[in-house]
Amino acid sequence: MHAARAPYNSSLHDITVEMQRLRKTYWAWTQSEWSEVICSTEGDFHQRFGASGNCRQYVMALAWLLCGFDRLESCGVFYQYRLCLKVFGRQHTDAAVFRLSEMMTAVGYVPGDGRNNGIRNALCMAMLLQREPQPERVNVDTLQYIASAGPAYLRKSAATLSRILASSGIFNEGFDYRVSQRRRPPREYNAVTDVPAEWLSWCERWRATSVQRPSSIEACWYVLLKCGRWLADCHPECVSPVNWTRETAMAWVTAACKMKVGEWSNPGGMYRERRGSMMKPSARAGLIRHVHTFFHDLQEWGWMPVKFSPERILRSPRSLSTQIGPDPRIVSDELWCKLIHAGQNLQETDLPGCVGYPYFYPLEMVRALSVLWLFGGLRRDEILRMRCGCIRWQASEENDGQRICLMDVPVSKTYAAFTKPVDSIVGDYIERWELVRSPQALQEDPKTGESVHFLFMHRGKRVHGSYINNSLVPLLCKKAGIPEHDARGRITSHRARATIASQLYNARE
């Protein structure tokens, strides 16, 4: 370990003192006894050994090398890189760190960015736990252990490292620390509070059996919980679907048609300003439709006797259906032109970021996302699920040989995959992004189950679903000098689709 004289003597002194206290040789110490000697912080170690407390890392190295000590998560904060230097040597440690730097650069990280030191420490921690100084031999189980039981300051970095190694082909798939550390499942809140146990058991059984899209199952699930609270208060004798009659179903339709925001629900802080106002017609119709789906499935699966027809009873009345129709929230021509100009002229200085640190996403990717949102006419989910190589060019005989840009759109909630012509600027900006896009690992398409190369991926992760609404649109509004809200409300991802569709519908040709 090439220790200097002072820490060398201090280490011998400290271990000798502890052997005398414990009345046994250091190689007979248990993991718990080593943890007690090493202490959970540098300050506690200094306080324990006084003037000879300047050698904590050397004591850890001796425990690791000579006695198989591996309870490193109990040691609190320490410099994993320096401990690796002591036990693996500088040559092996620096070679591993250099290999990690190459892999990070390959997936889009900026070399020398001080914010990435945590990833290096996570690698060193994994090598120490596996006793293996090669990044290629780190396994995902070790990183998951660090993310769940390791020091708090390394948990997020361990998940990030897993995605970097997955992108480099070391193992199949990384993991997301934020998902695994949620206190409850996504968007679950306290949704089952006050729902009768018997009704809840039927709902959970239906939820586990249904083969609809996950988003459709989730939407239906929350409506069923709302219905359960309504039953507990108004029809406690019908908390089992088996006890429902035609009259119960009609009572639910009546209640749904008069439903107000926050009624029969446990919304927490959501919709606080609108609470108590009448729900939108489409939302009230959804309450009826989802309960209809529930009873239709139960009867089709033979789980309950047929006492009424969901198709005839659980349907929206005409008075409600007539209130539902197309209502595109288009952006005015003036604001739309400013947004288009902003999207075509984004510069590095327009991207928010800390002083001295670049924006998380590359400029080329932000430009491609902006232009695709402004000209593509796609849903947010379709934009974020676009695949590499989605742009093709076709010569046109009618336009003096000018090329037509064709774009492959992935499977959506209403259509199979298809190809559509788009403005050439979309193809230009997407191809510019593909030229600088770092190689990324294959990921599973949540709709089709295929392993694909998503176009908008960076540092081993897809662009988050909230990025367009919460980051990109405000960025374009700021660049264009317009407010984020207009006469029709907040400018969101879907309003671009509504605006483009309305423009095409009203066009002469």
At which residue positions do the language-model features occur?
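Charge-rich, intrinsically disordered N-terminal extensions
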Residues: 1-351, 371-372
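Extended accessory and catalytic-adjacent subdomains in large enzymes
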Residues: 234, 239-240, 280, 284-287, ...
